Amino acid sequence: RRFAQQSFGTVNFSNHGAYCGQTYRVGTGAALGDLSGMPHGKPDWTNSRFGLFIGAAPAQAGNPFQRQGRELAEARSRPENTYRYVVVSPLLPTSSSQASGDNNRWLAVKPGSDLALVMGMIRWMLDNGRYDERFLSQPGPAAMQAAGEAAWSNATHLLIHQSGHPRHGHFLRGADLGWALPPPSQGSDTAEDVYVVQLADGSLAPHTSPQPAQLWVERSVTPAASPADPAPGALPVRSALFTLREEARRMTLAQYAAECGVPAAEIEALAREFTSHGKQAVANAHGGTMSGSGFYTAYAIAM
């Protein structure tokens, strides 16, 4: 800690063994909005029907690998034989071979290039409408409950998109528009500002509204006046999902393919298969993101 924080002045320090999947824990923790707790998911073997294992072949790697081996054996031996999985790895794993049956396949990838594969999948999914629109449209807990969903996301939350702005890339908050802070939530003494979303009628609302919000937003808003800026101009904003799509489009599918060594047709086929199972598809990479870009790889997988 002293070497990293005092010598280099970085806050990017975390106390955990790299061999145990530190980049995966931190990357997924960032995606889930909890860097201190570093939450991360495990495959729901009972309810899933398709598994994508990136650098973490079940029964051979991953965490906990012994339990995953047992879970894989159970899923693979179901009478209905509906569980399918793909193992992404530079090396042929034992969990994806002729001896393991015909309900799986191995996808070879260049070492350390998994991020390019995942971003290629994300680009194809967003370009072809292969995403869970109902889930992604719920901006907060109230909307989630009203829609009968199990979770909500920040896909609809608006981001400041003005080059040179001190908060370029940050979320737009209610205070930016002059909205009053909401009362503290139950069990807390501190009020937390809301995020801003656009509703179907084009109006702006807090993310706590009990209704879905728009996924694809690119517009301008007028910030609240302040002593430092008594006459603010229009501020360009974008929704988070719109921003993700634009970032994914910075490279073509062919460029992603060249980077990771997986043909573009294979990336498309994998993305199509992954999205054909709806909420019954899972992705896991615990221990499989140990590279220089591991944090970003884990973050992309979690998205």
Predicted features and spans:
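A conserved hydrophobic secondary-structure block that centers on an alpha-helix together
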Residues: G17-Y19, G37-S97, W106, E246
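Flexible loop/turn segments at secondary-structure boundaries
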Residues: R1, C20-Y24, A59-G62, L92-S97, ...
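Long, well-ordered, tryptophan-enriched scaffold segments
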Residues: P79, V86, S96-H277
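An acidic- and aromatic-residue-enriched active-site/binding cleft used to recognize and process polar
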Residues: A56-A57, P90-P93, P111-G112, R272, ...
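Glycine- and acidic
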Residues: F53-P58, N103, P236-V237, M251-A257, ...
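Acidic catalytic cores of enzymes that act on phosphate-bearing nucleotides/polynucleotides
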Residues: E268, R272-M303
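Anionic-ligand anchoring segments at beta-strand to alpha-helix junctions in alpha/beta enzyme folds, i.e.
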Residues: R1-N47
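Short secondary-structure boundary/capping segments
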Residues: R2-A4, Q66-R70, S100-L107, I122-M125, ...
